[in-house]
Structures are given as C-alpha cells and as structure tokens.
C-alpha cells in the first residue's frame, strides 16, 4: 500500500473517533437538559401543591384580612404557562434525542439514543455499532487503492516496454554525438595548452631583453680618509670599524660618555 493511503486511513479513523466523541457529548448534554427539565417539573408540582394547601386553609383562619388573599386565577394561569413551557421544552428535547446522529453519512442505531432505554452512551457502544461499517469502508478504499496500484504497475510496465523498444539507430547516434563532443573537448584543451605555452615563451623573451638592456652602474669603492703625517695619538681612542682615531675629551663629555682617567699624582703644592 501507498503511504498516502495509510495516512488517509488514519485521518479517517481519527475523524470517526472525534465525531463519535462529539455525539457522546451531545447525548450527555441532552440527558442533562432533560434531567433539569424533570427537576423543574417536580419543583413546580411541589409549589402548586403548597399553594393549594394554603388556599384551602385561608377561609378557616378568621384573623387573616381579606386584602392579603391571593387570587387563584393568577396562580393557575402562571402554573399553566409554566407547565406548557416545560412540556414544550421536554417535547423538543425528546424530539432531539429521538433523532439519531449521522456519522460519515450513516445513521447510528436509534435504540442507543432513545430516552426510554436510559442506556448510557459510550465510545465503545458507538465503536461497536459503527466500526464494522468503518472497516468495510476502509476495506473498499484499500481495494480501490490496490486496484490503482495495479493500474500504476501496468502503466509502469508499459512505459518500460516502450523504453526497451528504442531503436538501435538512436543509440548509435547518441554514441556518435558523445564521441564527437569528447573529441571537440580534447582539441579545445590542446589548443588552450598551446596558447598558454606561447604566451609564457613571449613573457620570458621580454624579460631577457629587459635584463640585457639594463646597464649595471659600477660601484664606487669609498676609501677611508687617512691622516697625513705623524701625529701624537692620545691614549683615549674609540674604534669605529675604520681604524683608531684620536678623540678629544670635549666631544666625549658632550656625548655623555664616562671616561676612566688614569690616576695621576697630584702636584706638590709649594709651602
């Protein structure tokens, strides 16, 4: 079976259960309304009986004034109106209860919903009465789905047969076209590779020409300046990598370099 058919069947089952639960709730509400109407009737009968007893005892009591006596016509009229309304409501309720609900286009058994039976309606009762019909409908649907699947399989087989009946000329033409496309792609790749090689050769030639045209300037060798003649060189010297040159103390003091002076004996002061 198709998964869609299973999903549809599950949806139908859920709808059936929901509808059955709704009928159960409606029936319970109708029973509640009927019980309330019966209670109202009982209360009205009690009130009327009390009123009758009062009217019977009123003429015997001499102390009660006449102005306080309630006329019986109004009570009778009100009681008749109340009873008529209650009867009409009860009759309407009985008519509503007598009409069985319809689920999935099928009428439920009226014996369950009759007020005389006083049988409590449950989901089990509804399922018992309607589950067979529901199963029959599901079986019919499943049979229809199976028939549709068989038809689809037949159509698929026919399509496969039609596909198998493709002529050999079409296959050969397809193979020729594929071979031609492969050859064209190979030729294009070869041409692209040749063009790339030619461009690289041109670039290399240009670079060689530029290197040849460039003139290398000779580097002048800078000779260190030498002092001419012999001069006394002080002991304090600095090495700058070129040679030892005499350095005056003033420049060193200006640079902030600490000098280590030799311990010279102090001159003797004359007395």
Curated annotation (Swiss-Prot):
Superkingdom per UniProt: Eukaryota
Region (Disordered), start-end ranges: 50-93, 128-233
Composition-biased stretches (Low complexity): 61-93, 129-165
Disulfide bridge map: none
Biased composition (Acidic residues): 180-199, 207-217
Skewed-composition ranges (Basic and acidic residues): 169-179
Protein name: Putative uncharacterized protein DDB_G0292438
Native organism: Dictyostelium discoideum (Social amoeba)
Taxonomic placement: Eukaryota, Amoebozoa, Evosea, Eumycetozoa, Dictyostelia
């Amino acid at each position: 079976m198709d998964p869609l058919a299973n999903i549809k069947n599950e949806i139908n089952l859920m709808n059936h259960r929901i509808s059955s639960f709704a009928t159960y709730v409606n029936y319970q509400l109708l029973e509640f309304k009927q019980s309330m109407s019966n209670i109202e009737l009982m209360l009205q009968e009690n009130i009327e009986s009390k009123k009758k007893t009062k009217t019977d005892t009123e003429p015997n009591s001499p102390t009660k004034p006449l102005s306080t006596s309630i006329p019986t016509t109004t009570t009778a009229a009100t009681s008749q109106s109340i009873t008529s309304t209650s009867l009409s409501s009860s009759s309407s309720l009985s008519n509503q209860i007598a009409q069985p609900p319809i689920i999935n286009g099928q009428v439920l058994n009226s014996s369950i919903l009759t007020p005389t039976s006083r049988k409590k309606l449950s989901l089990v009762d509804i399922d018992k009465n309607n589950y067979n019909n529901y199963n029959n409908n599901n079986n019919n649907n499943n049979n229809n789905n199976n028939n549709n699947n068989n038809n689809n399989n037949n159509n698929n087989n026919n399509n496969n047969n039609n596909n198998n009946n493709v002529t050999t000329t079409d296959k050969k033409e397809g193979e020729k076209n594929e071979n031609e496309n492969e050859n064209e792609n190979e030729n294009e790749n070869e041409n692209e590779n040749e063009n790339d090689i030619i461009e690289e050769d041109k670039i290399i030639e240009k670079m060689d020409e530029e290197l040849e045209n460039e003139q290398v300037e000779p580097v002048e060798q800078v000779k260190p300046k030498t002092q001419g003649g012999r001069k006394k060189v002080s002991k304090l010297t600095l090495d700058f990598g070129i040679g030892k040159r005499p350095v005056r103390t003033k420049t060193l003091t200006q640079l902030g370099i600490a000098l280590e002076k030799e311990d010279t004996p102090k001159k003797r002061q004359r007395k």
